[in-house]
Amino acid sequence: MNDKFFIDKTKEILKTYNLSPDKHPPKLSKEEAIKIINTLRELINYHDYRYYVLNQPVISDAEYDAIYKFLKSIEDNYPDLITPDSLTQRVSSDISSTFPQVKHLAPMLSLDNTYNEDDLRDFDRRVKELSGKEHIEYCVEPKYDGAGISLLYENDLFVRGATRGDGEVGEDVTKNLKTIKTIPLRANFSKQGIRLLEIRGEVIINKDDFKKINEERMAENLPPYANPRNLAAGSIRLQDPQEVVKRPLTALVYQITYVEPTNNMPKTHYGAIKMLHDLGFKTPFLDMKLCKNIQEVIDYCRYFESKRESLPYEIDGMVIKVNDISLYDELGFTSHAPRWATAFKFKAKQATTIILDVIFSVGRVGNITPVAKLEPVSLGGVTISSVSLFNEDFIREKDIHIKDTVIIERAGEVIPYVVSVVKEARPKDAKPIVFPKYCPSCGSKLVKAPGEVAWRCINISCPAQVVLRIRHFASKDAMDIKGLGEAVAQLLYDAKLVKNIADIYYLKFSDLVRLPRFAKKSAQNLIDAIEASKRRGLARVLYGLGIRYVGLTTAKKLASYYKDIWNIVKASEEDLRNIEDIGDIVARSIKEFFGLEQNINTIKRLEEAGVLLKEVSEAVSNKLAGLQFVFTGTLSCCTREVARQMVESLGATTSDSVTHHTSYLVVGQDPGATKLRKANMLGIKTISEEEFLRLLEDSK
C-alpha cells in the first residue's frame, strides 16, 4: 500500500463519518466497529510515521485528532476490542511508585573514545589485526546526546523498555516509553523470521523544544533545566505517564543487540539500521554513511562536526562501527566496551561570560566547593548560569576574580568548566575571591589536612551535611530505604525528627503521618522500608556512614576482613593498612571517623535499634538461583521487603511486575487483580504464602 492509499482512505473515513476533533464521533454497532477498527489503527500508525519519523505530515493536526478520537471512542464503547499495540495505549493512567529492575538480554556497554585522526587510525589498525582482514567497511553515524534505552519486541509487540542502569540491569519504564510516538508499539519483525529482538536507542529532546521549555520555566520564575540530556533522562523516569506524554521526547534506535532465532540477525549493521528504518523506527539511517576505509571515516566525521550547530538535536561526536556483524564475536569486547566500535568525540564548545558572584556550598563529607554565578550564556544550546571552581588552589592557579570575563567550555557536552581568564578585560572594580574560614552552613571553623586541597567542615551535626548524609545512608547502595530521598530527608530534618542517621530507626508511624506529603499508606511504607533495612549487613552500614574515602568496594573489604564493626573501631591504622588497597590516607580517615565520640554514639544507637553491624554474605546459598519472584497482596509472615530479602539470600531475584521472566507469583491476602490476570495470561505459576514458605524451607 502506497502513500496515496493511506491519504485517500483517511479522507474517505473523515468524510463518510463526518469526523472533526470538536465533534463527538458517531457510535457504531459492534459489527461496524470490528470492520473499521484495524483500518483506523493502520492509518494512525502511518500518520505517526510521517509526522514523527519523516517530519513530512500529509494531513492537518485537526484531521489527525479526528481519526484518533474516532478510534478512542470505539475502544471506549467496546473495551474487548482494545489490543496491546493499539495507538491509544501509549498513555496509561497508572502512576507507579517505583520502577522494577530488569536485566538486559545483552549488556549495554560504553564505547571507547577517540579524539583525533591518529586515534581513529589506531582503532582501524587494531580491528584489522584482530580480524586478520586487510579491508574493513565501517558505518559512521551521529552520537546522540540523550538518555540510553533498550527496547524489547516479542512476536512483533513492544513488550518492555528499560533505562541503561548499570549496563547489566536497568529500570522498567515501559509505560513511559509507550508515550513516545517514535517507538512503534508493533513492528513486523516476524516477516524477517525474528521472534524476539532487543534494540538499543536514545531518548532526546530537540534544541528548539528544549529552548522553548526553558523560556516557559523562566517566565514562571522557575530555574531552567541544565541540558536536554538530563531533561530527557528525568522525563522517562517520571512516575506518571500522563506527565511524560507532555514532554517533547523523541526516541532514536541505533543498534540491534539480540535476536531469536539467532541465525536471523541481519548480516551487516547497515542492513540492520535500514530494516529498523523501513519498519517505522526513527534511526540514524539518513545521516549514516558507509565508508570503505578509515580516511572516508575521518572525512565524514569532520564534515559532520562542521554542521553540528545547524542540527536540530545535540550530538557530541560520531560513532564508528564495523559493518560486518559476523566479525563482532571475533573482535570481542574489553571489560567495558566492544572492540568493533568506537566514538569520535568532537572538540568541546567554548564561550565567554562574566563571573557575577561566588557562593560556597557544603558537601556530604564537609568539603567546601566554590560555585561561580555567571552572566547566563548559551553554549551548545544549553544556558550556563553557574560553574564549579572546585577549590581554593584552582581559583589561585587561574587567578579568578569576581567580575572577571572568563572562557568556559562544555567538556563532553555536559560539564561546564572555566578554561581561562581574559585578564585584558578585567575591570578596575574586580574583586579577589576570598575563601571563607568558617562553614557557611553552621559557622564551624574550616580545616584543611596536610597535602589536601579541600577545606572542610568537620562538624558532623552541620545542617547542610546532615540532610545529605541521611540521603546517602538511605541510598540504594547503602541501606536502600525506599521512599527516603532528599526531599523526605529535608522534611524530617526540618521537623526535628531526624538530626542524625541513627534517628531514622527511632521514627514512629505517628511521627510521619502528621507530616505533609505523608498519608497513612506512605507513612507505613517508609516504616516497613526502614525495618527491612536493618538486615543489610556491615558492608552497607559502613558505606552508608559516609566515611571519607570509603566507597562500597572498600566497605566490603573491611566487612569481609573484620566481620564486626567493633573490630574496626578497635583496629589501629597499621592494622587497617594490612587490607588490600587501604593506604595511609584511607586508614587515617577511618581512624579519625571512629575517633569522634558522636560517631561512636551513632553506632551504639544503630545497634540498640537492631541494625545488623556484622558481615552478611550476599547469598546464603544459590538453591533458588535463576528464579524470579513477584509478590502481590499482604503476607502474614513478614513484609514484602523481608520476603524479597529471603529469596535473594538464596540466590533468586525479585521484581515488582509480572513479565515473561517471572518464575513465581506469590499471592498474599487482597492480591492485585492486574498481576493475577497477567500471570494467568503468561502462564506464570502462582503459589500461596504457605507454598512459598515451604519452598524457602526446602531450599535452605
From Swiss-Prot:
Keyword Hydrolase: no
BP GO terms, sorted: DNA repair; DNA replication
Cofactor(s) this protein cannot do without: Mg(2+); Mn(2+)
Record-linked PROSITE patterns: BRCT
Chemical reaction(s) catalysed: NAD(+) + (deoxyribonucleotide)n-3'-hydroxyl + 5'-phospho-(deoxyribonucleotide)m = (deoxyribonucleotide)n+m + AMP + beta-nicotinamide D-nucleotide
Enzyme Commission numbers on file: 6.5.1.2
Residues forming the catalytic site: K143 (n6-amp-lysine intermediate)
Domain BRCT, chain residue ranges per copy: 619-700
CDD domains: BRCT_DNA_ligase_like, LIGANc
Residues binding NAD(+), per UniProt: D61, A62, E63, Y64, D65, S110, L111, E141, R164, E202, K321, K345
GO cellular component: cytosol
Domain of life where this protein originates: Bacteria
Protein residues bound to Zn(2+): C439, C442, C457, C462
GO molecular function per UniProt: DNA binding; DNA ligase (NAD+) activity; metal ion binding
Pfam families the UniProt entry points to: BRCT (PF00533), DNA_ligase_aden (PF01653), DNA_ligase_OB (PF03120), DNA_ligase_ZBD (PF03119), HHH_2 (PF12826), HHH_5 (PF14520), Nlig-Ia (PF22745)
Summary of the function given for this chain in its UniProt record: DNA ligase that catalyzes the formation of phosphodiester linkages between 5'-phosphoryl and 3'-hydroxyl groups in double-stranded DNA using NAD as a coenzyme and as the energy source for the reaction. It is essential for DNA replication and repair of damaged DNA.
Family: Belongs to the NAD-dependent DNA ligase family. LigA subfamily.
Alphabetical list of PANTHER family matching this protein: CHROMOSOME TRANSMISSION FIDELITY FACTOR 18 (PTHR23389), DNA LIGASE (PTHR23389:SF9)
Name of the protein described by the UniProt record: DNA ligase
Species of origin: Hydrogenobaculum sp. (strain Y04AAS1)
Gene: ligA
